[in-house]
Amino acid sequence: MFLSMNWISDFVDFTGLDKVELIHRFSLSTAEVENEILFKGSDLSGVVVAEIMSVENHPDSKKLHLLKVDAGDGQLTDVVCGAPNVRVGLKTAFAKVGAKIGELEITPRKLAGYTSNGMCCSEKEIGISEDNSGIMEITDDFANGTDIKEAYQIDDIIFE
């Protein structure tokens, strides 16, 4: 059985306990924590909520778009994106330069003659679901620049 620490913390206050003490107490009072602890979201950093402010079709590609995104840092960032669902006003998950998604570190990259200074992400790329049909579509509830782990509560420890 897998249990989310975020879910358990809705019922129990863990303030001041480190992971080792928490595992010990959980094993004594509830159930043994078996083989491993999975750190959901631990391989994700620098990914934030961003809003697409402009979209232009790439002059030499039918699939690529040239975007300007607002990642909440006071400037617009140029991004090259091939997702079919890009549109002005869409809020999405955005990996800034320096962000890490698993083993991938985001760097400025030249794509079809244009520099992309980040990456708009699908749900699959950030580990929320297997959906890779387009970039994430996020509600307007979150301010630009909000850490995606905070917005989607994916910074979690899963006990087995």
Located regions from the model:
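Phosphate-backbone binding interfaces of nucleic-acid-interacting proteins
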Residues: 1-160
